[in-house]
């Protein structure tokens, strides 16, 4: 624990202070008056301040010229070191980005993490939209999505033969590949007219060459691209690239408009000032920056570090989009209140020991007694947390009750039990879960829903609720999510086993060819029905004939 004597020589000037324990960063803060701010920490009036001082063994102070410099330096250090007690924009961890790596021949990927190097575009709201966007753009420009060491690749993969990758592994023309990467950057920065013009040029070229197959391919890509953008709802007449920020009760909402299209609606809950939020949100962004930030919030900043104007004069469409942002904030708070009230109601109706702020749900899925899987889904404050979902392989168990007991032993010998466990099933499943918890010496509330009748089952009672009851709807949403996750994984295990037994028995089909075939055709049945000529282009005449013979 630090002694208050470390403050004797601290200046009263503005600056940044760093609490550390050895090499671990405990807390980083800024102050207009360093001595006054640090004295407040050492008064130990707040629990957080007490923990910071108790867990630190050193204090560093950096003096700067003014409060704005302190704000920027604080954001820089927090982004770099991610201290234990600093408030981060954690909601941002769940939003997806499109990343272009910094390799000599860059690859592209969808990721939720910004820990790697490279150029990031986003964040986007919806993972499905993000993946589809990258899939379409990858086919248009031919950039690679594989992460392989290109120097170890002997020949191009199937993507090259399908003309969806320029195959930088051939090392033929770096300028052409980097031009494709630059085109991709341009589109991801919001220049959607560029990609439309690019596709139309390709269509016209192939049409003139009487290559109608490729002309049709680019026509379909253009239609797919336009259809995907139209799913975003708001499309403006102009091609602005603007961020609209609404703020209320420590919740920030950012509407990202790029190329006149509303690409993202991003919520962040953080106990930060408006200026602190701006620095945390925009710090580290080297691309995908707006031309301006529009907000009703008063700010001491005329522009942030990247020279982005703030609070410029608003036109009618600016006001319209800010009104949309604030309406969404209202709905956010309304939904939050409803979830909180529903959790309280769940406690009362089910007779729980405490409000179930954390609910974990499980469902057992199998295929005729094989590929048995337990899915785990997590809801916190009534909101799903997909990043904490897990799947547990249980082998070939046909007994539903024993599967539940095995899952609980696997999960809760290593992890803390939640406020409430949901199991998909009735009295038998609930009792099996309770028995397993008793074996572990844990007293955990368990609830299930019997299929078809929608009868709610707890340790001591069984009852029905009206179809529109919020408690029933919440439990059903958890059940449906567990069911979806379990079935998707069990199905993938079945497919994996099936492909092993079929393709691996064919001479000449190794892991690489198998991967190529399944990526192209998705299933054994599709491979079986594929034209011989088409298969020959992918795996050669000899292997294509063998596929036809064996399948």
Swiss-Prot record:
UniProt xrefs under PROSITE patterns: GIY_YIG, UVR, UVRC
Lineage: Bacteria, Thermotogati, Thermotogota, Thermotogae, Thermotogales
This protein's record includes keyword NADP: no
Subunit comment: Interacts with UvrB in an incision complex.
Pfam family, one: UVR
Keywords attached to this entry: Cytoplasm, DNA damage, DNA excision, DNA repair, Excision nuclease, SOS response
Cited function: The UvrABC repair system catalyzes the recognition and processing of DNA lesions. UvrC both incises the 5' and 3' sides of the lesion. The N-terminal half is responsible for the 3' incision and the C-terminal half is responsible for the 5' incision.
Molecular function GO terms recorded: DNA binding; excinuclease ABC activity
Source organism of the structure: Thermosipho africanus (strain TCF52B)
All residue ranges annotated as the UVR domain in the record: 193-228
GO terms for cellular component: cytoplasm; excinuclease repair complex
Name of the coding gene: uvrC
Entry-linked CDD domains: GIY-YIG_UvrC_Cho (cd10434)
Keyword Cytoplasm included in the entry's annotation: yes
Protein name stated in the entry: UvrABC system protein C
InterPro entries: GIY-YIG_endonuc, GIY-YIG_endonuc_sf, GIY-YIG_UvrC_Cho, RuvA_2-like, UVR_dom, UVR_dom_sf, UvrABC_protein_C, UvrC
Protein family according to the UniProt entry: Belongs to the UvrC family.
Major site of localization recorded for this protein: cytoplasm
Annotated localization: Cytoplasm
């Amino acid at each position: 624990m630090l002694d208050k004597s470390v403050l004797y020589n601290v200046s009263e000037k503005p600056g940044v202070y760093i609490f550390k324990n050895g090499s671990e960063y405990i807390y980083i803060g800024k102050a207009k008056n360093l001595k006054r701010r640090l004295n407040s920490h050492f008064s130990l009036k707040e629990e957080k301040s007490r923990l910071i001082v108790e867990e630190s063994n050193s204090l560093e102070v950096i003096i700067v010229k003014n409060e704005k410099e302190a704000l920027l330096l604080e954001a820089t250090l927090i982004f770099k070191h991610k201290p234990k007690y600093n408030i981060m924009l954690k909601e941002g961890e769940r939003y997806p980005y499109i990343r272009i790596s910094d390799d000599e021949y860059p690859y592209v990927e969808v990721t939720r993490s910004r820990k790697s190097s490279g150029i990031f575009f986003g964040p986007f709201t919806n993972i499905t939209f993000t993946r589809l966007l990258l899939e379409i753009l990858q086919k248009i420009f031919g950039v690679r999505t594989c992460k392989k060491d290109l120097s170890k690749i002997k020949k191009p993969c199937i993507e090259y033969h399908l003309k969806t990758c320029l195959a930088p592994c051939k090392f033929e023309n770096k300028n052409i590949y980097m031009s494709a990467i630059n085109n991709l950057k341009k589109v991801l920065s919001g220049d959607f007219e560029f990609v439309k013009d690019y596709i139309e040029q390709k269509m016209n070229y192939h049409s003139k060459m009487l290559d109608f197959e490729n002309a049709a391919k680019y026509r379909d890509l253009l239609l797919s691209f336009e259809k995907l953008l139209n799913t975003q709802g708001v499309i403006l007449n102009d091609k602005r690239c603007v961020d609209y920020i609404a703020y209320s009760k420590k919740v920030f909402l950012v509407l990202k408009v790029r190329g006149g299209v509303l690409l993202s609606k991003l919520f962040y809950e953080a106990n930060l000032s408006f200026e602190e939020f701006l620095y945390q949100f925009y710090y580290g962004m080297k691309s995908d920056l707006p031309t301006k930030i529009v907000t009703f919030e008063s700010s001491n900043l005329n522009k942030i570090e990247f020279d982005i104007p703030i609070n410029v004069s608003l036109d009618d469409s600016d006001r319209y989009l800010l009104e949309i942002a604030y309406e969404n904030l209202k709905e956010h708070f309304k939904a939050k209140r409803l979830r909180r009230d529903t959790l309280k109601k769940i406690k009362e109706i089910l007779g729980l020991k405490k409000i179930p702020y954390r609910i974990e749900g499980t469902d057992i899925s199998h295929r005729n007694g094989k590929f048995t899987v337990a899915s785990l889904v997590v809801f916190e404050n009534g909101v799903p947390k997909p990043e904490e979902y897990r799947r547990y392989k249980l082998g070939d168990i046909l007994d539903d009750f024993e599967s539940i007991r095995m899952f609980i032993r696997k999960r809760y010998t290593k992890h803390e039990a939640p406020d409430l466990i949901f199991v998909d099933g009735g009295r038998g499943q609930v009792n099996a879960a309770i028995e397993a918890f008793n074996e572990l010496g844990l007293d955990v509330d368990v609830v299930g829903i019997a299929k078809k009748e929608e009868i709610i089952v707890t340790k001591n009672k069984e009852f029905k609720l009206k179809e529109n009851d919020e408690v029933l709807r919440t439990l059903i949403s958890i059940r449906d999510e567990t069911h979806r996750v379990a079935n998707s994984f069990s199905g993938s295990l079945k497919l994996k086993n099936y492909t092993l037994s079929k393709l691996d028995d064919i001479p000449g089909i190794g892991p690489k060819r198998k991967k190529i075939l399944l990526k192209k055709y998705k299933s054994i049945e599709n491979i079986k029905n594929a034209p011989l000529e088409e298969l020959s282009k992918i795996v050669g005449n000899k292997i294509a004939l063998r596929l036809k013979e064996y399948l």
